[in-house]
Amino acid sequence: MGTKKNILLGTISIIHSNWLPYAVGCLISHCKSIDQVNQRYHFHEPIYKHKPVTEYHTVLANTDILGLTCYVWNQSYNDELAAYYKSINPAGIVVYGGPQVPENQLAKISYDDKRSWLDTSIAGLGEIAFSEWLLDLPFSNSTLTTMPTPYTDGVFDSILATGEKFKVSFETNRGCPYSCAFCDWGGQSRSKLTKFNVDDVYSTIAKIYDYKNIVELEILDANFGILKQDIDIVQAMIDNQNLKDNYLRISYSGIAKNGSKNLPVILEKIFDNIPIDQRNLKISFQTHTPEVLANINRSNIDNSRLAPLILEYKNKNIPTTSEMIIALPGETAHSWLRTLDYNFHTLGIDYVRTYFLHLVANIDMATPEYQQQHGIQTKTIAIGHQQFEIIHRCNSYNQDELVRMFDYHWFYHTLVNTNLIKNNINNIYKDTLRFFAQLDDMPVLKSLVERNRSLVRNIFSDEPVTTLTNKHHQRFFSASMRTDDIVVILENQIAVAEELSAFVQQPLEVEWLSDNPLSADATIT
């Protein structure tokens, strides 16, 4: 047997430098379970930090194969890193995987051909396909049935031993039975729900809770709570938390989409046992517009099941947050305002968190057929190393309609989400329209609205690529969907209070915050 080849795998996080690289950790864990791979290859410690590519020079110079997990947010950086690797190691091999690699064969050829430094890319679920590629075996398109266990296999031991604070993630199952048009969690290769051995899940949880420098744990399941075993998994986290006196922040990528009889039990355990600052009922709706839900192949939790759940947690003073996507195909300014109104009055949602619609590879919405059907025109937003494809026109909206849609969002996000006039609102729909009809009488707030309109027009302009360099504009697009509006309001408290008092037709009683928050969840009172 000759000298082993060195493999360097990386899942680079652009914004968060302390997320352990779970995706490539799974590849390493799976590959190390195969004797033939161990005989031929050695794996370097996986990389995960976003830093100047030259700082990876030493390890790259000693690498035969560089494998990178590609997402929409790190594709540009991965390209820079891979090109640099080829410049210092021309004989080295670059392989890409991850959600950004197209599964459509023609799109994949185009993706590969644009990158002269790329030797191969592997689409779809990665562990089995990557090991087959390493062993020169034909791709079997097999589905992984055994849970990768990078934590208990020691893949991350050397990284965790540094003592830095880390956020970690893992799956208890894989796949999604739904196929929402905007999401790549479902689809042909990922629509089957694979349940992993629960003992492996328990061992992983126990290992994670052994580390006091792990501060946050995210469950990556698309529909946590869909399986009965999820109740026991939550209990295992609670037991480890109490046994080891290690109170991690717990988050979930996705809660069971259409409700589940297991969900109330799971939420009860979470809310009764996790520290108070971590308690929040988060529900993903995207929209409440029936035509739009049909366009995106999605159905929301039935209100008859949802309303009692929300009421139960309101009675326990547990806030509810709804997650929405603005400007889905079929949405209009009017329908979006109706959606906000429904959240507030019918469901009693405490906070509405809204996201931009990004198009990624391997979703229905990115296919030519879907885009032709809905009259979709796309463009690119560039922020540093990150590039995002967005829709800037479709059958239901043009730029002017988008400006009105974002006007209504601005009103809700700036004045209602912040608690500024939440208690003075009688009817979200009517009060929003009345606010903009009276906007000329509110000079400070009008200046913020006009500034917001200008930014929205810039983002959704017809130019093929718009680069955002202003930090507030970047935050608006990629994080909070607001600039520094809250800061400006706090700096002009007296004038804003007078303007809003006239609008709500009663004195505005506000206990202003002493600092100037910029976060997406910032409140004023």
Predicted ranges, named:
Residues 31, 84-88, 237, 313, ...:
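Hydrophobic positions in alpha-helices of CheY-like receiver
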Residues 65-67, 202, 208-220, 244-251, ...:
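Conserved C-terminal portion of the radical SAM core fold
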Residues 107-109, 134-135, 230-231, 265, ...:
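Short aromatic-enriched loop/helix-cap "lid" or pocket-rim segments at secondary-structure transitions
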Residues 2-12, 36-41, 50, 58-64, ...:
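Radical SAM enzyme core and accessory elements
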Residues 151-315, 326:
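Radical SAM [4Fe-4S] cluster-binding motif and immediate context
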Residues 2-211:
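Acidic, low-complexity intrinsically disordered segments
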